[in-house]
């Protein structure tokens, strides 16, 4: 993949990005790189700074400090050069209330040299039978139309802000299949999400953002590693440090919320035995025991001490 001037480049480079709204620091030194042809997910809870980051990358906001380059260009100064190659899906939609789906898509398609076939795109996203005006569309219909608007120009890079929010399960799966097809076609995708299954299924690279900072970055496999998770419920307020001391080296024990415990370790029968024995010695009994691979949510909880959906 090449930049607009013909040179090979990463699709997006964000370096020490900072942004404030009045006295509120929304972004504090955010840095990451998006490889051309990849799917990168910005993962974090609502209010983490994901949308602000994407809006700077799209050229809708100027950074307070730091820099952003899209195909090697400044997204604000070089907006005209980037516009034909970049698709944007906005949470707010940016569509007139009286507009209807197909006329909107046909109008947008007229601005591009090689647009996608509007009827095919509308059918794929279930918009071909939507007759309501934008103000009367359901939340899911608005999301599907916003996604179609981002894709109709056949972009080389597309920003998708919470692409499946408000969609029913079938529409969500369809949107995921479209993202997977975009990657297969060599299109670079940057999406924001707080949905773990969305990030784990779609992303080649995940950037975990919390309170305006990047707290981790890597492929889903790199972030989750080889550790497994044992969860159980017991009396609230147990000494998690004392329990961890009875487990194999490197084991991590957390309580969140009160009375719910997570043990991250390479699990084996000896770990379950040690947990059960320690609980018994401390006057409680573990129940609701389950185990599985460490997830991105486990990683987020470990890094921030709070649930991803908080």
Q: Predicted segment positions?
A:
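Conserved ABC ATPase "signature" region
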Residues: 106, 110, 116-131
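Catalytic Walker B motif of ABC-type/P-loop ATPase nucleotide-binding domains
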Residues: 158-162
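ABC transporter nucleotide-binding domain
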Residues: 175-266
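Helix-to-loop junction immediately C-terminal to a conserved catalytic motif
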Residues: 58
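Conserved ABC transporter NBD signature motif
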Residues: 66-74, 81-82
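Hydrophobic anchor residue at the start of the ABC signature
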Residues: 147
């Amino acid at each position: 993949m090449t930049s607009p001037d013909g040179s090979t480049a990463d699709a997006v480079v964000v370096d020490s990005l900072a942004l404030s709204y009045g006295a509120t620091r929304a972004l504090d030194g955010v840095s990451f790189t998006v490889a051309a042809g990849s799917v990168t997910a910005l993962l974090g809870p609502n209010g983490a700074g994901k949308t602000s980051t994407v809006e700077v990358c799209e050229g809708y906001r100027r950074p307070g400090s730091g820099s952003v380059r899209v195909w090697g260009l400044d997204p604000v100064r070089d907006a005209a050069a980037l516009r034909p190659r970049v698709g944007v899906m906005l949470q707010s939609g940016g569509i007139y209330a009286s507009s209807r789906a197909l006329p909107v898509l046909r109008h947008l398609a007229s601005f591009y040299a090689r647009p996608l076939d509007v009827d095919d795109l509308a059918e794929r996203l279930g918009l071909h039978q939507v007759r309501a005006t934008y103000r009367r569309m359901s939340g899911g219909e608005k999301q599907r139309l916003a996604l179609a608007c981002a894709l109709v120009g056949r972009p080389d890079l597309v920003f998708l802000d919470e692409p499946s929010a408000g969609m029913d399960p079938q529409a969500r799966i369809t949107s995921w299949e479209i993202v997977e097809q975009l990657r297969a076609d060599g299109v670079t995708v940057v999406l924001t999400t707080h949905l773990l299954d969305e990030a784990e299924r779609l992303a080649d690279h995940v950037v975990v953002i919390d309170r305006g900072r990047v707290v981790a970055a890597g492929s889903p496999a790199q972030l989750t590693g080889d550790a497994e998770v044992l969860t159980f419920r017991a009396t609230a307020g147990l000494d998690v440090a004392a329990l961890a001391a009875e487990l194999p080296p490197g084991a991590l024990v957390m309580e969140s919320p009160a009375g719910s415990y997570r043990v991250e370790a390479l699990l084996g029968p000896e770990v379950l035995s040690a947990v059960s024995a320690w609980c018994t010695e401390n006057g409680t009994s573990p129940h609701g025991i389950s185990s599985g691979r460490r997830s991105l949510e486990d990683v987020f909880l470990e890094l921030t001490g709070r649930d991803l959906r908080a």
